[in-house]
C-alpha cells in the first residue's frame, strides 16, 4: 500500500512574491500607449531611441532602454525604408543637347514636352515612374511605370503622350538629366513618330 507524505511547512516568501499576479502599473500602461501611438505616427520606422526622444518631448520620462523593452512587449519592430541607388551602367551615355534653353513660356499646346523619371518604394522593391509634361498645359500627358529604369520606360511614357495628344507633329521633347534615355533609341522613336528633336 503506497504511503503519501505532504510537507506541512510554509512556502518560501520569494516563491510567493515571484508567482503572485502583478498589480497593474498605470504609468507603464500610459507609456505603452505612447510607444504604440508614436510607432504608428512614424509608420513603423521609429526605433527605441527615436520613440524615447519623441515621448520625452511630449512630457513622458522615457529612456531608450525602457522604450526598447516596451516595444518588445508590444511586438513592435522598426522597419527602415532602404535607400535607393541607381545601378551604374556599363558605358557613358551620349550627352543630349538642350534645345529648350530654359524657355518655359510656351504659347500653344503640343509644342514642348519635357520628361523625368523618379523612383517610388512599393513596400518590397523600388518602382520607377516616367512622366511626360506638356509645358503649355503644365500637366502630365503621358506616364509609365516599371521595375527597371531603362529607355523602354521613357519610351512608353512618350508613346502614351503621343497617342493621347492625337499624334502631333513637330513636338520638342526635352529630357531632364535624370531621365534614363539612350540617344539612339529616343532618336529613332522621334524619327518614327515625328515628335521632333530630343
Curated annotation (Swiss-Prot):
Keyword vocabulary terms for this entry: DNA recombination, DNA-binding, Transposable element, Transposition
Protein name: Putative transposase InsO for insertion sequence element IS911B
Residue span(s) of domain Integrase catalytic: 105-198
GO term, biological process aspect, one: DNA integration
Top-rank taxon, per record: Bacteria
Species, as recorded: Escherichia coli (strain K12)
Pfam family, one: rve
GO molecular function per UniProt: DNA binding
Lineage of the species this protein comes from: Bacteria, Pseudomonadati, Pseudomonadota, Gammaproteobacteria, Enterobacterales
Amino acid at each position: 500500500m503506497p504511503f503519501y507524505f505532504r510537507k506541512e511547512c510554509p512556502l518560501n516568501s520569494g516563491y510567493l512574491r515571484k508567482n503572485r499576479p502583478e498589480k497593474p502599473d498605470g504609468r507603464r500602461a500610459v507609456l505603452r500607449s505612447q510607444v504604440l501611438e508614436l510607432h504608428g505616427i512614424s509608420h513603423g520606422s521609429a526605433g527605441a531611441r527615436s520613440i524615447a526622444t519623441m515621448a520625452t518631448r511630449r512630457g513622458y520620462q522615457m529612456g531608450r532602454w525602457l522604450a526598447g523593452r516596451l516595444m518588445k512587449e508590444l511586438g513592435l519592430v522598426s522597419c527602415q525604408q532602404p535607400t535607393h541607388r541607381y545601378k551604374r551602367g556599363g558605358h557613358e551615355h551620349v550627352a543630349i543637347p538642350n534645345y529648350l534653353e530654359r524657355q518655359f513660356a510656351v504659347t500653344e499646346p503640343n509644342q514642348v514636352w519635357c520628361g523625368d523619371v523618379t523612383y517610388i518604394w512599393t513596400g518590397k522593391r523600388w518602382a520607377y515612374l516616367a512622366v511626360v509634361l506638356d509645358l503649355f498645359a503644365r500637366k502630365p500627358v503621358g506616364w509609365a511605370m516599371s521595375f527597371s529604369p531603362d529607355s523602354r520606360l521613357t519610351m512608353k511614357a512618350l508613346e502614351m503622350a503621343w497617342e493621347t495628344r492625337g499624334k502631333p507633329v513637330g513636338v520638342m521633347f526635352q529630357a531632364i538629366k535624370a531621365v534614363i534615355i539612350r540617344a539612339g533609341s529616343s532618336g529613332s522613336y522621334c524619327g518614327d513618330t515625328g515628335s521632333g528633336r530630343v
